[in-house]
Amino acid sequence: MLGFLSYGFIGIGKFMEIFFPWEVVSQYVPWDIPVQYVPHFYGIFFTAIATFYVMLGGMLSIVWTDVVQFLIMTVAGVVIAIIGMNMVAPEMIREFVPAGWESPFFGWTLDIDWSERMSLLTERMADEPYSLMGVFVMMALLKGIFMSMAGPAPNYDMQKILSCKSPKEAALMSGSVSVILLIPRYLMIMGFALLAIYFFKVDGGLEQMTAVHTDFETILPHLITKYVPVGLAGLLLAGLLSAFMSTFASTVNAAPAYVVNDIYLKYINPRASVRTQIRASYLVSVLVVVISTVMGFFLKDINEIFQWIVGALFGGYIAANVLKWHWWRFNGEGYFWGMTSGVVAAIVMKFTVPDSLVLYFFPVLFGISLVGCIVGTYSAPPADEETLVNFYIRVCPWGWWKPVAAKAVARYPQVTRNRHFKRDMFNVAIGIVWQCCLTIVPMYLVVRGTGGLIASVLLLVVTTVVLKYTWYRPLCREEKEYDELMKRIGMN
């Protein structure tokens, strides 16, 4: 959570610096700020606004503003895609990219040579983890599988899942996120990619940025100010700020829920009044933002914290969150020591491993966290039988639950074990293809790759039909069976 907030702090600072030139703003600031800390000043200003917005608004306002902000973001995404398509013809794309760029296939190495077209990009890619593409994809796939097995991340994603009325609604909400978000997101991303091609190929952008030693992470706001008309630029800026506010608000709003409910009320002040809980939530929100802001001052760039979050921190927490669903013996001590060992190892790795290699150390982090989980689990007794049986009946999980399943069936003969593992794994495979198509379709649409667009749309339609019969219909049927079971055994 702190890592994500630091990521947003650095990003919003660099982004807004382009739109609000320091030469103009500095006239109204009563103190001198070194040039290298100007993005941090902007970051502090906008995160402070967002923090008060979260504290004063609460959960309901965050939900409704999320809806409004998404609509703004969708319009902005469509606009930027249209602008990019009007400025860059398909022939220009083919002239700009090197051989092999259009192919989805690759070997152990990426083998795409940008040296003749954009030598500075070749130098930048040497510092990224993508050269050994085969290993990178294997590590990313391995991490993705375990992240999926871990269920919703223990942040605002979990809050949104738990706020749904039923398992069916939770599943539909989770699935609809891909449909709603991916298409406008990648329309905007590919629109900016086309504008970048125009910038580098037609407007001599490489020479301009090299001459003034421009940070490549600020290309996006440069493109907006250079190619987007004034009125639309305002809309786009509002859309991107909306995306920041939405993510920032949801992340900050999750922190008080965990700290106040799981620590303050449980161990410090169980009888706290509602007013006291609200004040504690305000304090936690401010502390989380302050700590993440301080962390942001020690980061070199956005990519640095991004690589650490997706490669190291995720690797540190995944093991504990996988085991909590799939192993009956797992307990609170195992979760604590697994999370602690994983996060501590991730922090150590932050200072000992180059950022470009973090993802390759995912198995190491996962192994350290897994050992912490197992040692912590056997250092304490298992959860009480009532809790385990109740969890098994309500969740019906996969994995190593045989002793608990036997007790649940003995107590409630109507209960049956989850025997749909093969069907669910088939749905996972189809779902991966379906979600990839949702990503690829807007990309092919913007670059006008007719063959790829037709193929991906057809594949999207086929996988949607398959999921209707193998996922949605069983979901509806099993929802009714679940409700009837809960009534029969008196757990409704």
Predicted regions and their residues:
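Loop-to-transmembrane helix boundary motifs in multi-pass membrane proteins
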Residues: 1, 32, 36-44, 260-300
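Helix-loop-helix module between adjacent transmembrane segments
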Residues: 1-55, 125, 140-150, 242-250
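Transmembrane helix-loop junctions in multi-pass membrane proteins
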Residues: 4-25, 53-60, 191, 199-201, ...
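Membrane-water interface regions at transmembrane-helix termini and the short interhelical loops
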Residues: 14, 18, 48-70, 160-166, ...
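Loop-to-helix junctions at membrane interfaces in multi-pass transport proteins
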Residues: 23-41, 71-234, 384-406
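Hydrophobic alpha-helical segments embedded in the membrane of multi-pass proteins
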Residues: 44, 48, 309-322, 340, ...
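Central hydrophobic cores of alpha-helical transmembrane segments
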Residues: 73, 77, 334-345, 390-392, ...
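Terminal cytosolic tails of multi-pass membrane transporters
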Residues: 100-102, 164, 354-492
